[in-house]
């Protein structure tokens, strides 16, 4: 378990969206944006966490939810599960489907649809678009 000043999170594993979405890297800071356009783009790979209510409220605020990003339940295919605190009957099998909250946005520039679609985000990925913290731009 990881304890933050804003709540607690437990890494559970890796998953992939059942539905395709466009994941683009945009703006001056090279920010990853998951565009809420189901059926377009790629199946997105990401980490799965269990978070407490305190951290969930912090994340909503951090992501500008619901105005900038929207937190919606999405079907996620389990790629690998590492949740060691789960009882055997709570551990989802590989390739099974669970529902997780995902932050995506309907607020984007039309030209973002012409950007490359990524299947996952890594600030140091081979796309060469390293994330720039806001304070480093100013």
Curated annotation (Swiss-Prot):
Keywords: Lyase. SUPFAM superfamilies: Gamma-glutamyl cyclotransferase-like. Its EC number is 4.3.2.8. The active site is at residue 63. GO terms for biological process: modified amino acid catabolic process. One of its GO terms (molecular function) is gamma-glutamylaminecyclotransferase activity. It catalyses: epsilon-(gamma-L-glutamyl)-L-lysine = 5-oxo-L-proline + L-lysine. It holds the Pfam family GGACT. CDD domains: GGCT_like (cd06661). GO terms for cellular component: cytosol. InterPro entries: AIG2-like_dom, GGACT, GGCT-like, GGCT-like_sf. Coiled coil: none annotated. It comes from the Eukaryota. Belongs to the gamma-glutamylcyclotransferase family. May contribute to degradation of proteins cross-linked by transglutaminases by degrading the cross-link between a lysine and a glutamic acid residue. Catalyzes the formation of 5-oxo-L-proline from L-gamma-glutamyl-L-epsilon-lysine. This is Gamma-glutamylaminecyclotransferase. It comes from Xenopus laevis. The lineage of its organism: Eukaryota, Metazoa, Chordata, Craniata, Vertebrata.
């Amino acid at each position: 378990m990881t304890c933050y000043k804003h709540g607690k999170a437990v890494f559970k594993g890796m998953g992939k969206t059942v539905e395709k979405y466009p994941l683009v890297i945009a703006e001056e800071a090279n920010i990853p944006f998951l565009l809420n356009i189901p059926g377009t783009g790629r199946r997105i790979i990401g980490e799965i966490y269990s978070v407490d209510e305190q951290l969930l409220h912090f994340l909503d605020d951090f992501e500008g939810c619901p105005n900038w990003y929207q937190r919606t339940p999405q079907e996620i295919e389990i790629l690998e599960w590492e949740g060691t605190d789960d009882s055997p009957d709570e551990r989802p099998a590989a390739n099974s489907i669970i529902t997780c909250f995902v932050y995506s946005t309907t607020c984007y520039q039309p030209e973002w649809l012409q950007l490359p679609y990524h299947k996952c985000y890594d600030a140091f990925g081979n796309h060469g678009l390293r994330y720039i913290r806001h304070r480093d731009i100013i």
